[in-house]
């Protein structure tokens, strides 16, 4: 398994540098500066994904972005 990408109990994945925001997720090492769990619909950029915002149609559009 890629040490930079860890599975999340919620079914997504997270990348960690700082302490991970995803409960139950720990990463051995990482070169990423971000850490977040990504929903299934954001799988295309799950490795470098940051999920933010609330819920709802408008929030969903802005929820996922990829780390540079």
Swiss-Prot record:
The name under which this protein is listed is Metallothionein-3
Record-annotated residues binding a divalent metal cation 6? 38, 42, 45, 67
Instruction: Tell me which residues bear Phosphoserine.
Output: 33
Per the UniProt entry, what species is this protein from, by scientific name?
Bos taurus
Keywords, A to Z, come to: Acetylation, Copper, Metal-binding, Metal-thiolate cluster, Phosphoprotein, Zinc
Amino-acid positions noted as binding a divalent metal cation 1 in the UniProt annotation, renumbered to this chain: 6, 8, 22, 25
**Where does this protein hold a divalent metal cation 2?**
8, 14, 16, 27
What is the gene called?
A: MT3
Query: Which top-level group of life is the source organism from?
Result: Eukaryota
């Amino acid at each position: 398994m890629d040490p930079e990408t860890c599975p999340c109990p919620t079914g997504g994945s997270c990348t960690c540098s700082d302490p991970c925001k995803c409960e139950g997720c720990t990463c051995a090492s990482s070169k990423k500066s971000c850490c977040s769990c990504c929903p299934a619909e954001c799988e295309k950029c799950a490795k470098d994904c940051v999920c933010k915002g609330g819920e709802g149609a408008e929030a969903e559009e802005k929820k996922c972005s990829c780390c540079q």
